[in-house]
Amino acid sequence: MEAYKDIVNIDTELLSGQPVFTGTRVPIESLFMHLEKGISLDEFLFDFPSVSKEHAIAVLEIAGKIVSSKNIEHIYETTT
C-alpha cells in the first residue's frame, strides 16, 4: 500500500483542511457518504473521475486498519 500521504492530502488552504484524495478536491468523506447510502464504489468513481480506483481502495484499507486497531478506543476518543 502506498504511504497515506500519497493518497490523502490535508492542506488548510484546500477545503479548510478537510482530508481530500491527493491531487483532487474530492473530500475523503464523500467516499464514505456514498457507501453509507448504498452507492457502489464504481458509481462513486463515475461521479468523481479524478479519484483513481486504487486510491479509493487504499482509503478503505486505511479505514479498515484503523477500526481493527487495538488503539481504536484511543483514536475514537481523540476525534469525538
Predicted feature locations:
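N-terminal first-folded block
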Residues: M1-R25
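Intrinsically disordered, low-complexity and often Lys/Arg-enriched segments
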Residues: M1-Y4, I75-T80
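Surface-exposed beta-strand edges and their flanking turn/coil or helix-capping segments
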Residues: P19-T22, L35-E36, L41, E73-I75
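Amphipathic, hydrophobic secondary-structure cores in small proteins
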Residues: P27-E61
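C-terminal structural segments of small proteins and small subunits
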Residues: E54-E77
